């Protein structure tokens, strides 16, 4: 039995509320159970220096957690004067994942920055950030298209992410914190709307896993991604 009472293949409730920020070109609030992440997309009219005069655009991400997103207060990283290794790893993952769904030549020489701020954390914050970040990105690109700033849609497919793991000896979908903190194996799966893999991160936390178990987790992830893509489409109308 899962702590939440969910079935092994059952996602947490998912909702994506678009256009929640006045100034950002794209934004949404994604809720996956008790994990809530505010995602925004900001368009910058020039690319990073390493892409100057290449005709290519860029998508990057920044990630952070509010001090009281967790059960006890975490000190702001700005107050500490540096980002943790975890934060840097997660924001690089978000950027990589979202770039995989973009034709950067169609985007042109500009950069879109995705900011993901965790309001409340209960496991799966990086996956929620990728899924919500894509919605914010899609909304920002829509504004570029509507304004005639770009003529071809650079978004080639949806991008979403979900966690899966081995909990109490059973493969489960969409781990919350109670499961994630005690899972024998856990992984993050980033897929496109067509179920093509962008990134798979799996690690044995308490017990090694078999190839068959990895396949079972991938099957769960594909089903979960399908639900998330449907939520993305519903949010966009």
UniProtKB/Swiss-Prot annotation:
Gene3D superfamilies: GHMP Kinase, N-terminal domain (3.30.230.70)
Pfam families linked: RNase_PH, RNase_PH_C
Presence of the UniProt keyword RNA-binding in the record: yes
Enzyme Commission numbers on file: 2.7.7.56
GO biological process: rRNA catabolic process; rRNA processing; tRNA processing
Alphabetical keyword list: Nucleotidyltransferase, RNA-binding, rRNA processing, Transferase, tRNA processing, tRNA-binding
Biological role stated in the UniProt entry: Phosphorolytic 3'-5' exoribonuclease that plays an important role in tRNA 3'-end maturation. Removes nucleotide residues following the 3'-CCA terminus of tRNAs; can also add nucleotides to the ends of RNA molecules by using nucleoside diphosphates as substrates, but this may not be physiologically important. Probably plays a role in initiation of 16S rRNA degradation (leading to ribosome degradation) during starvation.
Subunit and partners: Homohexameric ring arranged as a trimer of dimers.
NCBIfam families, sorted: RNasePH
Name of the featured protein: Ribonuclease PH
Organism encoding this protein: Cereibacter sphaeroides (strain KD131 / KCTC 12085)
């Amino acid at each position: 039995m899962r702590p939440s009472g969910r079935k092994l293949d059952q996602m947490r409730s998912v909702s994506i509320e678009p256009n929640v920020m006045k100034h950002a070109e794209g934004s949404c609030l994604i809720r996956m159970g008790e994990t809530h992440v505010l995602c925004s997309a900001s368009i910058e009219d020039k690319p990073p220096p390493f892409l100057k005069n290449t005709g290519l655009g860029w998508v990057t991400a920044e990630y952070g957690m509010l001090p009281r997103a967790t059960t006890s207060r975490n000190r702001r990283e700005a107050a500490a004067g540096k980002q943790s290794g975890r934060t840097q790893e997660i924001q690089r993952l978000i950027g990589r994942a979202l770039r995989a769904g973009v034709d950067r030549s169609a985007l042109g020489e500009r950069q879109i920055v995705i900011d993901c701020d965790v309001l409340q954390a209960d496991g799966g914050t990086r996956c929620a950030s990728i899924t919500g970040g894509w919605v914010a990105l899609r909304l920002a690109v829509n504004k570029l298209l509507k304004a005639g700033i770009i003529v071809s849609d650079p978004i080639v497919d949806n991008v979403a992410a979900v966690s899966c793991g081995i909990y109490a000896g059973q493969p489960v979908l969409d781990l919350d914190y109670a499961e994630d903190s005690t899972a024998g194996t856990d992984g993050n799966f980033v897929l496109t709307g067509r179920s093509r893999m962008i990134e798979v991160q799996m690690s044995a936390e308490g017990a090694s896993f078999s190839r068959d178990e990895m396949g079972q987790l991938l099957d769960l992830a594909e089903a979960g991604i399908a639900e998330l893509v449907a939520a993305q489409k519903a949010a966009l109308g």
